[in-house]
Amino acid sequence: MIIEELHIVNFKSIAAADCRFSPKVNCLVGNNGMGKTNLLDALHFLSFCRSHLSVPDNMVVRHGEEMALLQGLYRDESGDGIELLLSIRPGKHKVLRRNKKEYERLSDHIGHFPLVIVSPQDYQLILGGSDERRRFMDQQLCQQDPRYLSALIQYNRHLQQRNTMLKQDRHDDALMDVLELQMGSYAAEIYNKRSRFIEDFLPVFNDLYSDISGSAEKVSLSYRSHLADGIPLEELLRRSRPKDYLLGFSSCGVHKDELEMLLGGVLIRKIGSEGQNKTFLISMKLAQFRHQQLHGDETPILLLDDIFDKLDATRVERIIRLVGGNGFGQIFITDTNRKNLDEIIASWSEDYRLFEIENGQIFQ
């Protein structure tokens, strides 16, 4: 999958832009705060119908304007052209059209335009709470498996309903039994698919970390869940119900799962240096790309947002060699340093385009 053209109106700091991209390498240069990340976020929005930066929709419409528009012209691996048109109005539902036909549900769009982004905000994957790491697993699986996405949506709806019931003075245990049985069914599917995903993902991640770091450091991932002992969630919920009534929320379930990230058998967030953390993160995201490529129908678009800062020259060279190989498709790279991008371009013989971005304006 590649994007050939992107047209932007009133998205964040970008008042208007018309971009035509290389099918291989696209370099975006500009100082911080000029709009490089906003352009990448527009691409992310077209794939996932939300910002990578987890900001609400009303914050992506340019200040003082009523609506933002994003239009992307794509070409899939069979050679077919596809137009996406997304309109965003604060306080209203987003409207997404594919080849002029509106989606009834935005969730039906997820996974058809695969994209992987590596950015400074992704440090929360290592340093943040467990919800960040669950989101990582969920995003990958939702792109590949509509049934997983459906199970996750239904589980979260039932979880919200159970939490509401836990706060009520009157306890309806019969209704709670039914609700917990349904949650157990969805949770089993989520747990099983997360477990298989990590089993498939781990060797890919290990190989990439070794390639980038050039060291024998042992890294690993460990998936922890209340369901790991084989007890159905409905039974766990029934046992925890008295405690949960006191707490006012559900204290067990797949919404509490954890993905531990380990360096030498210890949580990397406790011992990792800045360089080790960054290498771990980039390896995770490139492994996400590889996994999506292996298990999806289309090669994802890869966005690398200011990832070379604080990495030594050797690791930068290894990353460039990896993503410059034939296994990667269309790539977008941002940097504040024009010299860095010139060196990257010089190492590639691929078709490339360079864009300079200043105060929300994009120059090619």
From Swiss-Prot:
| Record key words, sorted | ATP-binding, Cytoplasm, DNA damage, DNA repair, DNA replication, DNA-binding, Nucleotide-binding, SOS response
Q: Specify which residues bind ATP according to the UniProt entry for this protein.
A: G30, N31, N32, G33, M34, G35, K36, T37
| Cellular localisation | Cytoplasm
Q: Where is the signal peptide?
A: none
Q: Which Gene3D superfamilies match?
A: P-loop containing nucleotide triphosphate hydrolases, RecF/RecN/SMC, N-terminal domain
For biological process, the GO terms are: DNA replication; DNA synthesis involved in DNA repair; double-strand break repair; SOS response
Instruction: Give this protein's Gene Ontology molecular function annotations.
Output: ATP binding; single-stranded DNA binding
Q: Which GO terms describe its cellular component?
A: cytoplasm
**Where is the major localization of this protein?**
cytoplasm
Which function does this protein serve? The RecF protein is involved in DNA metabolism; it is required for DNA replication and normal SOS inducibility. RecF binds preferentially to single-stranded, linear DNA. It also seems to bind ATP.
**Family indicated by similarity:** Belongs to the RecF family.
Check the record and name the HAMAP family matching this protein: RecF
Q: Identify the PANTHER family for this entry.
A: DNA REPLICATION AND REPAIR PROTEIN RECF
Record protein name field: DNA replication and repair protein RecF
Which gene produces this protein? recF
